[in-house]
Amino acid sequence: MKYLLLAVTTALAFLLAPSSQADPSHVTCYVTAESTGQRLAEAGTEDLVDSPSITEKQEYIFVDPSKTFQTILGIGGALTDASAETFYKLPKSKQREILKAYFDPKNGVGYSLGRTHIHSCDFSSESYTYVKDYDTNLDSFDISHDLKYRIPFIKAALATAGKDNFTLFASPWSPPAWMKDNTNMLHGGKLLPQYDDCWARYCCKFLQAYEQQGMHIWGMTVQNEPLAIQPWESCVFSAEDERDFVKNYLGPEIQKEGLNTKIMIWDHNRGLMYNYASAILDDPDAAKYVWGVAYHWYVNDSFENVKSVKEAYPEKHLLFTEGCNGPFDTSQLTNWIWGEKYATSMIHDFDNGVEGWTDWNVLLDEKGGPNHVQNYCFAPIHADTKTGKLFYMDSYYYIGHFSKFIRPGAKRIISSSSTDNLLTTAFINVDGTISIIVLNLTDQPENFNLWIHGKVAQNVSPAHSILTLVVS
């Protein structure tokens, strides 16, 4: 495998934070484009100037900052056992580079949202839990396993991002084997009813244990991919199962323990999300405990289902919690389609009301792991643990076009394209800067005018490119 070592000075020096002090009539363009060396590169500044009347002979991106929608929680990725273990196999200099690349808002892409898991998932080197078998009192509860790699990695990420600038949530892949009808953490199975209360208390123990380590878990999903029977850690919850577990056990237990943890349901693909979510949210005794609906991108796009959930339950929130490309194949590391898939999903998800967007593993090794069931996949950064070299996939830059310039607290605003060749979404940050994403999936460059309140700035979107236009 041939890896491209991207030094901090060359890979990240161009990542300059937008200034809230600049003249508000300026538009600064950042670009990542195929068949060029441009990766989140600053590509110049244009002035917004008074526009004559619009014409059908030109293309436009129309932006209206006066129309605001959802507030953004954050954008980021998953801090898994696999990411942490890979991280600590690297030289200290590479560890520092990764932390800066992901979590530094000025010199990196400023990840502000992270997911982790409750005991093991497939991207762990082994299956494990935090208690001894059949300890229903949970007296043996112990997170020592996580203290070796995962907790120090999360703490390092928080320190780089700034604790107040980073939101962390968690998901369980499976209860312990002895709580399930198949007596196995793997291959699906269901939580036995006699352990509903024990499992709810177990989840709260995890939240409290991480809090004691100085890591606040803002929220949790009830079950990762609750309808999937997988060769790795998995557990089946029907919509009715999840509704009753939240209503009778998890919600009351979190409340009883005085935790402010947000509960998210579903945490599976878009295709079935409306049917599953409605079965829970139509029950007021369950819905009162539910902050929102989490979902993934696998199987199909079905963006209309995201919109349907938001329209039907406008008081609830939406969070994208997992997406990745795979299976891992070294010959596909430079395939441009991976980055485009991220940007396409992110634009449609945000435009349909999602408040945060979380990639899967932030870091994997030269095999796309470690993974104890060989379910290897791609991550935005891969590390060769033998040589210490890092490989930045194009997806790192595509996600960075969002995470760096759309900060927590931003609000989505109107952004519409006059051409099918350009996809767009836009946000206004707390500091007043406006960030507009423009995605070109075609083989041809596209000239367009950025139009804001009667003023325009001319731009060009290269073939197979993503732009972030920062109006400041």
Spans of model-derived segments:
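Short linear sequence signals and composition-biased patches located at protein termini or domain-edge surfaces
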Residues: Y3, F153, A463-S465
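Short, solvent-exposed turn/loop segments enriched in Gly/Ser/Thr/Pro and often Arg
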Residues: R115-D122, S171-P175, T221-E225, D267-R270, ...
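A short, flexible beta-alpha/helix-coil linker loop
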Residues: D81-E85, P226-I229, G326-P327
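Cleavable N-terminal signal peptides of Sec/SRP-targeted secreted and luminal proteins
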Residues: K2-L16
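Substrate-binding and catalytic surfaces of secreted/luminal carbohydrate-active proteins
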Residues: D23-V63, L168-A170, R201-A209, Q213-W218, ...
